[in-house]
């Protein structure tokens, strides 16, 4: 089904939903996160901890509860660096400036550089892809080499 062209208002809506979702997630409020962001059936994730790409979004109660336990007491502000729109896609390049308790670690800066690809589907905008890296702060070539080696 053909949709109307993407307008500035669509990009603003997706940006707003992204900011609300980031704030909810870093607080561990996964169910609230899901009120802002729906995931496409072919969703892919390149998570900030590395590893193989994830395919699909596990919305089982067990997965949502595990995610909720992983994040605590944080706050986030999303800085949109650039946005692109074409056809039924909106791409956001953002920095999620956030802090919180992640895993068993105390509260700290967890800011991420993130690329998000949203696709317009029946029922609204769905997140099709997320690529996040924690490299908001510069690192040395040697540190990058160690990360690339997996050490």
Task: Identify the meaning behind each predicted range.
Residues 1-36, 146-151:
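Short, low-complexity N-terminal intrinsically disordered segments enriched in polar/charged residues
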Residues 110-141:
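Short beta-strand edge/turn micro-motifs at domain boundaries
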Residues 21, 78-83, 96-98, 113-119, ...:
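Hydrophobic/aromatic beta-strand elements that line small-molecule binding cavities or substrate pockets
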Residues 30-87, 95:
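A solvent-exposed, acidic/Ser-Thr-rich amphipathic alpha-helical stretch
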């Amino acid at each position: 089904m053909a949709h109307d062209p993407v307008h500035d208002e669509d990009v603003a809506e997706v940006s707003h939903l992204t900011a609300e979702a980031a704030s909810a997630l870093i607080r561990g409020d996964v169910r609230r996160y899901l009120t802002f962001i729906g995931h496409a059936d072919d969703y892919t994730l390149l998570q900030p901890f590395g590893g193989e790409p994830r395919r699909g979004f596990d919305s089982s109660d067990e997965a949502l509860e595990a995610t909720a336990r992983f994040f605590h007491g944080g706050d986030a502000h999303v800085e949109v660096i650039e946005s692109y729109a074409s056809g039924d896609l909106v791409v956001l390049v953002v920095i999620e400036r956030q802090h919180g308790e992640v895993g068993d670690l105390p509260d700290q800066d967890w800011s991420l550089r993130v690329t998000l690809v949203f696709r317009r589907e029946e029922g609204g905008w769905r997140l099709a892809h997320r690529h996040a890296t924690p490299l908001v702060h510069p690192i040395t070539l040697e540190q990058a080499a160690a990360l690339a080696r997996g050490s």
